[in-house]
Regions:
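Mid-chain, structured segments of secreted extracytoplasmic proteins
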Residues: 87, 180-181, 186, 253, ...
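Alpha-helical repeat scaffolds
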Residues: 92-99, 192-200, 258-263
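Pro/Ala/Gly-rich low-complexity, hydrophilic intrinsically disordered segments
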Residues: 255-277
Length: 353
């Protein structure tokens, strides 16, 4: 029996009842969660996450408010997640978890928001959105951070509304960038993605954010996306990048005759491009990819590799598990330039000054 077990056998039995989801073991697990041994407490909390129902959530959040042990706090977070994710009614589970927020202190509220992101659903999103509109600066910051990594397209209209109605410039930027992230990463009908791209281009205040939209257009080429890129090209600061996106769509089901007319009307001219040297990697773990890059460099400032992955295009990963960059030295029309690009970024070479 779990209630009579001692030492390592107690931990083994707690793991067993968790695997079997033995609800009757909840009282013994609850008692073990107060044990002096950190290993016993951690095993007990993991077990509680596997067997208790959502009615127990307030006790877990109350415990989260009092613990000073980082590992125990992480175990409590996991238990909260497990309880909600096991629930047959996740909306009801999210509602119960959200109901614990008013009584929680600031740090616990932040952790609850993170858990709601994992649980997902309408109630979770509603709760996080409300936090993003609150007067509490810490809570707002956490809510915007959570919305920035939300796991469904449902957050898009909320992010747009937040962008349009918050006063803080930093939050406006985070909202529109999160909105663009949804357009870039999630499955959705082509019409909706195109509409989101149009909206983002009209709404974003900074050219840097509008350029993120251009990357979305290039990732999902279509006649509609081409039309959006051509519209963006009317903005002087975006003209070059937008036209390069149009070029990048060539050969992917786009009407080539219309593409040629559009490029001629835009006055986009080819350049004389030379790749002087190119290296890919991080620090000393860098490989020379000059010859490979030269194979794909044409007479445009955008270079299209055979794969969206630099590792695939350049024949391997020179620095596994490390953030890498592609550094290129080049000449355009005889003028020397240099650019550093984050891993897998679209290769667009700036005009040298």
């Amino acid at each position: 029996r779990l209630s009579d077990a001692k030492g390592k056998m107690r931990i083994v039995l707690m793991d067993l009842v968790a695997r079997r989801r033995t609800a009757a073991a909840a009282p013994a697990l609850g008692k073990a969660a107060d044990d002096a041994d950190p290993a016993v407490r951690a095993a007990a909390l993991a077990g509680l996450g596997a067997v208790i129902e959502t009615a127990y959530l307030p006790k877990l959040t109350a415990r989260l408010a009092t613990t000073k042990d980082a590992k125990e706090a992480a175990a409590l977070d996991k238990a909260l997640q497990d309880v909600c994710l096991r629930s047959q009614d996740r909306e009801a589970a999210a509602a119960r978890l959200a109901a614990t927020m008013p009584a929680a202190d600031g740090p616990v509220k932040v952790r609850i928001l993170e858990t709601l992101n994992i649980v997902g659903g309408a109630k979770s999103l509603e709760t996080v959105a409300a936090a993003a509109r609150s007067d509490n600066k810490e809570l707002r910051d956490a809510a915007f951070r959570v919305l920035g990594k939300w796991k469904s397209v449902d957050a898009a209209p909320i992010l747009l509304d937040l962008h349009n109605n918050v006063d803080d410039k930093r939050f406006k930027i985070r909202a529109i960038r999160a909105y663009i992230r949804i357009a870039r990463q999630f499955d959705m009908p082509a019409e909706r993605r195109a509409a989101m791209c149009r909206t983002a281009l009209k709404t974003a205040a900074r050219d840097a954010d509008k350029r993120l939209v251009l990357e979305v257009l290039l990732r999902y080429p279509s006649n509609e996306m081409q039309a959006i890129a051509l519209e963006a090209a009317k903005t002087p600061a975006l003209k070059d990048e937008a036209m390069l996106v149009v070029i990048g769509m060539a050969g992917k089901g786009i009407n080539r005759a219309e593409l040629g007319k559009a490029l001629a009307q835009a006055g986009h001219k080819p350049v004389k491009l030379e790749i002087v040297k190119a290296g890919y990697g991080a620090g000393k773990k860098t490989k020379d990819v000059t010859k490979i890059l030269r194979q794909y460099a044409k007479n445009r400032r955008i270079i299209f590799l055979p794969s969206a992955s630099y590792n695939v295009s350049f024949g391997g990963d020179p620095a596994p598990n490390i953030v890498k960059q592609l550094k290129i030295k080049y000449r355009i029309n005889g003028k020397e330039g240099e650019v550093s690009l984050n891993e897998n970024a679209t290769i667009v070479l700036p005009i040298p000054k």
